Swiss-Prot record:
GO molecular function, one term: myo-inosose-2 dehydratase activity
Pfam families listed in its UniProt record: AP_endonuc_2
Protein name stated in the entry: Inosose dehydratase
Superkingdom classification of source: Bacteria
First and last residue of the signal peptide: none
Pathway(s) it belongs to: Polyol metabolism; myo-inositol degradation into acetyl-CoA; acetyl-CoA from myo-inositol: step 2/7
Enzyme kind, highest EC tier: lyase
Source organism of the structure: Clostridium perfringens (strain 13 / Type A)
Cofactors required: glutathione; Co(2+); Mn(2+)
Gene3D superfamilies: Divalent-metal-dependent TIM barrel enzymes
Gene: iolE
Catalytic activity: scyllo-inosose = 3D-3,5/4-trihydroxycyclohexane-1,2-dione + H2O
Keyword field: Cobalt, Lyase, Manganese
Length: 297
């Protein structure tokens, strides 16, 4: 299964959490990438403890035969002047380009509640009006063109608590944006958490999917988040997310759709948990074994 153009990566968020820095504060950058390599992963996204000096970061990764797959970028196209987002995006793009990454992960954070500790994730989500949708799509097309200038692709990350979370919102975004400028990051965990049919979304947009986050969920924990009106971050602390093979999502059909459509790019394990409870190396190894078992990668 899968051709040689599919790579495996893992996100540092299991070791150190960017949104809640107390989670994993004791874990160093070197420990993080060493354990990723030890578990058998090639790529990483960029965490808050990673050096931003290209040469320093490259050397640390090359010592472990690793590379940067991408890094998250927060856009504020619906709440701030476009120029502010563009300036930050160009800087982000150039850093990733220097690191050899091919895709740029973008998520609209205007009106987002994902980082609010007390806002119920299932109740407080903002819904864009038509004018805001137009602003978002036009801005993303411009950013996508800037990515293309460097031979890179903008991959949009649908995410819990943001203005693009549901199937309907993903449909709207895909419809309003240029398919040659704006691509999709498929995140299994965020779709299932939201109550969507992740497989159907993947089937519909597989040819625009250029980056994949393999995230599993514990359905009982998600039900508790909904019942107790917890925030996204409170859900993370509760253990709503985990690595593939440890939760309730069946990844075999997901792998099959990707393989049948000749997916190329990264399959990146991303599962934020409390590292004091879920040992990052142990869970990285668990994920790696599961992926090997199901895909032979």
């Amino acid at each position: 299964m899968f051709n040689s153009n599919v790579k495996l990566g893992i996100a540092p968020i299991a070791w150190t959490n960017d949104d809640m820095p107390d989670l994993g504060k004791e874990n160093t950058f070197e420990q993080c990438i060493s354990e990723m390599a030890l578990a058998g992963f090639k790529g990483s996204e960029v965490g808050n403890k990673y050096p931003r000096d290209v040469e320093v970061l490259k050397k640390a990764l090359e010592l472990r035969d690793m590379e940067i797959a991408s890094a998250w970028f927060s856009a504020f196209l619906t709440t701030k002047p476009y120029e502010e987002t563009e300036k930050a995006f160009i800087e982000h793009r150039d850093f990733l380009n220097a690191m050899g990454a091919k895709v740029i992960v973008v998520s609209e954070q205007g009106h987002s509640i994902q980082g609010q500790m007390e806002t119920p994730i299932f109740d407080g989500k903002y819904v864009l009006n038509e004018e805001e949708w137009k602003t978002l799509a036009e801005g993303l097309n411009k950013l996508g063109a800037l990515a293309k200038e460097k031979g890179m692709k903008l991959v949009y990350h649908h995410h819990m608590g943001t203005v693009v979370q549901t199937t309907e919102e993903i449909d709207k975004l895909m419809d309003l944006t240029d398919e040659n400028l704006v691509y999709l990051l498929f995140d299994s965990g965020h779709l299932v958490y939201s109550g969507e049919d992740a497989l159907e979304v993947l089937k519909k947009y597989v040819n625009r999917v250029k980056h994949v986050h393999l995230k599993d969920i514990r359905k009982k924990k998600v039900e508790e988040v909904k019942r107790d009106k917890l925030s996204f971050l409170q859900g993370v602390r509760k253990g709503a997310f985990t690595v593939p093979g440890d939760g309730d999502i069946d990844f075999e059909p997901i792998f099959k759709v990707l393989d049948d459509n000749n997916y190329e790019g990264y399959l990146l394990v991303e599962a934020e948990q409390d590292p004091a409870i879920a040992n990052p190396l142990e869970y990285a190894i668990k994920a790696r074994k599961y992926i090997k078992e199901k895909t032979n990668l």
